From Swiss-Prot:
Residues 1-70 are annotated as: Disordered. GO terms for cellular component: eukaryotic 43S preinitiation complex; eukaryotic 48S preinitiation complex; eukaryotic translation initiation factor 3 complex. Residues 39-66 have a biased composition (Basic and acidic residues). Belongs to the eIF-3 subunit J family. PANTHER family: EUKARYOTIC TRANSLATION INITIATION FACTOR 3 SUBUNIT J (PTHR21681:SF0). Keywords: Coiled coil, Cytoplasm, Initiation factor, Protein biosynthesis. InterPro entries: eIF3-like_dom_sf, eIF3j. This is Eukaryotic translation initiation factor 3 subunit J. The gene is HCR1. Its main location: cytoplasm. Component of the eukaryotic translation initiation factor 3 (eIF-3) complex, which is involved in protein synthesis of a specialized repertoire of mRNAs and, together with other initiation factors, stimulates binding of mRNA and methionyl-tRNAi to the 40S ribosome. The eIF-3 complex specifically targets and initiates translation of a subset of mRNAs involved in cell proliferation. GO terms for molecular function: translation initiation factor activity. It is found in: Cytoplasm.
Length: 267
């Protein structure tokens, strides 16, 4: 064998060593000791989804679906109601966004729009008339806080309108238990001159009532007059014949007297 053959075998041996080393490296790593247990390879864990992000996405989806539902419902409404609902929905959305923003920032101050809305509601509640009961003192009504002449006139008109309607329920109780005693009680703080003026006013009212009652009474009687009184009737007019026929004139048509005529008159 020549030296060339040695070189050939040496080259092939080197190639075999390279192949063996590559295959050895490709196999599993050698354990440090025979007693060591095999540890399974750790699986690649996928990152857990963020629950907060999912919650925000779900809330946004819910808000979007609710908004779509509102839009579908208001499509059948008129233009004015639709604008009011859209404005209200926009305001609520702004308030919710502001509340979320302030909550995340730790700010507890009230939103300006919410404060303005609350003040408007308070003013509306204050302007709403309170419900009166039997236990409510009547002097607590704003009409009794009058100072000017017009305020007193408004109070008088309101009281007169409210009290006079009680006469329709019971005229007897109205006159005996309410009106007469009320006039006396109201006149107590007045001066003598003011009481005299009140009496004169009542006298004028009394005369007017007498005239009204007389007219009503005469209207029911046929032929009655305001001056002649009720029940008197007008005398019937007699026809004037000019004295041609009188009761005292006597006409004797039953006696035949022909003494004034002679026999020669009929010849």
């Amino acid at each position: 064998m020549s030296w060339n053959d040695d070189d050939v075998f040496a080259g092939s041996a080197n190639n075999d060593d390279v192949v063996l080393m590559d295959s050895w490296d490709a196999e599993e790593p050698i354990m440090e000791s025979w007693d060591a247990e095999e540890t399974p390879a750790k699986k690649e864990t996928s990152p857990k989804p963020d629950s907060k992000k999912n919650a925000k996405k779900d809330s946004k989806k819910d808000k979007k679906s609710s908004t779509d539902q509102v839009l579908l419902e208001i499509d059948v409404l008129d233009e004015k109601t639709r604008k009011e609902l859209l404005k209200k929905a926009e305001l609520e959305s702004d308030l919710n966004n502001a509340a979320e923003l302030f909550g995340s920032l730790g700010v507890a101050e009230e939103h300006p729009r919410a404060r303005a809305l609350r003040k408007e509601q308070e003013v509306a509640d204050a302007m709403r008339p309170a419900a009166f009961t039997k236990d409510t003192p009547i002097e607590s009504h704003p009409l009794f806080n009058g100072e000017s002449k017009k305020d007193y006139q408004d109070l008088r008109k309101a009281l007169a309108t409210a009290i006079v309607t009680m006469n329709e329920k019971s005229s007897l109780n109205y006159s005996s238990s309410l009106a007469i005693d009320l006039i006396r009680d109201v006149a107590k703080p007045m001066s003598i001159e003011s009481i005299r003026q009140s009496i004169a006013t009542l006298n004028v009212l009394m005369k007017d009532k007498e005239r009204e009652e007389r007219r009503a009474r005469l209207a029911k009687v046929k032929g009655g007059t305001a001056t002649g009184g009720a029940g008197k009737k007008k005398a019937k007019a007699k026809t004037n014949l000019g004295g041609a026929f009188k009761k005292d004139q006597e006409f004797d048509m039953g006696v035949d007297t022909y003494e004034d005529f002679g026999d020669d008159d009929f010849m």
